[in-house]
């Protein structure tokens, strides 16, 4: 399984110019596809007054301006059309595992970068929380190229492998406190930890939440290596895995399928939109297809 070593891989900062170009279609799909409705109904804001016209709602009359001008004026409001995006990214030890060529975290990092550049292209504010066994980094949503570079610089940093565990539940709760307006939230994780569902319920009651599960072929199939020692990266539990055993292979494959089904059911039950992406897939292709759909469920 892969570790978190990025040797030989260009950083997101180094790839910024190319990513800006490749995410234009993704940005358009985000703005016009599944989440188009989120650009509407974010609230209304006062934009000025104009003279009353026949048919206007009399409840909109601005009586102060009308009194000063001796002509009836009505208040004009405009709908906010700004979509705010927030990324909750898992950097725990289990995210350092993956395929031979790419870890789960490297896949998550690419997904986060693509969404960040799509947000920049649409002038959408974007922020993030990074976590492992503790909250590592918090950035409130802002818009513009400088914000993009700040986020990418943190996505590029090597995860701290000294910190065990995962505080996804705390990250979800913290995001709910940070976000002051309805937002599109992406939770990017392998979701191996427990006790995150209650926090998802609360977050999804105020925001639109997409749960992005980073999978890997090793979730279902392991190479035949005989009996090998295995240490769970999250809890440190050690066990022997007989990878040549047919019964073990069958059990491993079925457990992987059941975990995926439980996660999918849990997301839907608690208000999240499930999206699975494998370390072997192209994140841009998967995200473009996801955003271009008129319905996500």
What are these regions (language model features)?
Residues 58-60:
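N-terminal juxtadomain amphipathic helix
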């Amino acid at each position: 399984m892969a570790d978190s070593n990025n040797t030989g891989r260009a950083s997101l900062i180094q790839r910024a110019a190319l990513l800006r170009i490749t995410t234009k279609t993704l940005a358009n799909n985000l703005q016009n596809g599944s989440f188009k409705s989120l650009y509407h109904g974010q609230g209304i804001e006062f934009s000025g007054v104009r003279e009353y016209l026949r048919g206007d709602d009399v409840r909109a009359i601005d009586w102060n301006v009308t009194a000063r001008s001796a002509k009836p004026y009505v208040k004009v409001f405009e709908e906010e059309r700004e979509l705010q995006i927030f990324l909750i990214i898992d950097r725990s030890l289990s995210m350092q595992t993956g395929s031979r060529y790419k870890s789960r975290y490297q896949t998550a990092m690419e997904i986060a970068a693509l969404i960040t550049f799509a947000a920049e292209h649409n002038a959408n504010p974007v922020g993030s929380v990074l976590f492992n066994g503790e909250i590592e980094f918090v950035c409130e949503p802002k818009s513009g190229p400088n914000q993009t570079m700040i986020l990418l610089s943190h996505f590029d940093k090597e995860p701290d492998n000294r910190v065990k565990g995962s505080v996804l539940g705390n990250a979800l709760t913290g995001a709910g406190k940070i976000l002051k307006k309805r937002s599109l939230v992406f939770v990017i994780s392998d979701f191996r930890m427990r006790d995150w569902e209650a926090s998802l319920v609360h977050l999804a009651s105020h925001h639109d939440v997409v749960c992005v599960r980073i999978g890997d072929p090793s979730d279902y199939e392991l190479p035949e290596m005989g009996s090998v020692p295995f240490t769970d990266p999250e809890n440190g539990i050690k066990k022997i895995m007989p990878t040549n055993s047919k019964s073990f292979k069958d059990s491993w494959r079925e457990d992987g399928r059941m975990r995926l089904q439980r996660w999918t059911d849990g997301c839907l039950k608690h208000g999240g939109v499930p999206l699975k992406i494998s370390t072997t897939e192209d994140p841009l292709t998967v995200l473009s297809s996801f955003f271009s759909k008129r319905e996500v469920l």
